[in-house]
């Protein structure tokens, strides 16, 4: 199927898109800010127009899409333990009016801790955005070693971790709790009561495309479980 898309793009170019259509703030933040930060770093050492890139923890793939559309990347393989990227064709259609996502983007669901090295050609650059705080401590060294083995000699690895656990909002729960360092000041049970009692909308920039899958109460439980699973090291 991918070769058909590549042929289409060779003949007619990328599908038309229009950033003026963007209405979702989560999309805007990752399509603009996150992509610009990644490109500022990766683009300073690699030519993204020719580089083979791997995104470890690609999420919904919005940042990858922006790197292709706004910065000229031509080959990005995204991997994640969840399948949020499967929503990208719909998201791109709704937010950009795109009929199809670029052929240079590929995605894969992986098992936590499963090695990637040796399964695909070596890459020029690896990027990871807000992922490693979710990796369990005993998996950190093996995963870093595995990713290093995925890089060509002289390749580059861009890693972003935010927020850091011991920072004011390191719980990743700011969408529900605006008290700085609250996760370090109260018990887990007390913190959950704050999250559970929250009423009203949450910041649009913090409302990802998985929210609708869970519903209001289900999403609270999901993000709180994500907080509980943080490695508390990064």
Residue ranges, per PLM feature:
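Conserved class I S-adenosyl-L-methionine
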Residues: 50-59, 158-201
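A short acidic, Gly/Pro-enriched loop at the edge of an enzyme's catalytic core
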Residues: 115-126
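Class I SAM-dependent methyltransferase SAM/SAH-binding core
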Residues: 61-115
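A short glycine-rich, Lys/Arg-flanked "PGG" loop and its adjoining helix->strand segment in the class I
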Residues: 141-153
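Class I SAM-dependent methyltransferase Rossmann-like catalytic core
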Residues: 6-45
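Short alpha-helix
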Residues: 225-234
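A short SAM/SAH-binding and catalytic strip from SAM-dependent methyltransferases
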Residues: 124-138
């Amino acid at each position: 199927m991918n070769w058909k898309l590549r042929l289409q793009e060779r003949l007619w170019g990328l599908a038309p898109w229009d950033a003026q259509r963007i209405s979702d703030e989560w999309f805007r933040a990752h399509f603009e800010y996150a992509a610009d930060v990644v490109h500022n770093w990766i683009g300073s050492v690699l030519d993204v127009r020719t580089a083979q890139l791997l995104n470890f923890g690609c999420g919904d793939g919005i940042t990858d899409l922006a790197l292709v559309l706004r910065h000229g990347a031509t080959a990005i393989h995204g991997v994640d333990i969840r399948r949020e990227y499967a929503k990208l064709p719909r998201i791109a259609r709704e937010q950009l009016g795109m009929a199809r996502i670029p052929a240079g983007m590929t995605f894969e669901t992986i098992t936590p801790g499963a090695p990637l090295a040796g399964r695909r050609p070596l890459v020029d650059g690896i990027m990871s955005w807000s992922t490693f705080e979710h990796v369990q401590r005993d998996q950190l060294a093996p995963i870093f070693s595995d990713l290093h083995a995925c890089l060509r000699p002289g390749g580059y690895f861009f890693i972003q971790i935010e927020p850091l656990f011991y920072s004011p909002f390191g719980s990743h729960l700011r969408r529900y709790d605006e008290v700085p360092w609250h996760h370090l000041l109260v018990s887990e049970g007390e913190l959950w009561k704050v999250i559970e009692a929250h009423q009203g909308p949450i910041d649009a920039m913090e409302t990802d495309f998985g929210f609708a899958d869970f519903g209001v109460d289900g999403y609270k439980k999901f993000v709180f479980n994500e907080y509980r699973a943080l490695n508390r090291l990064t």
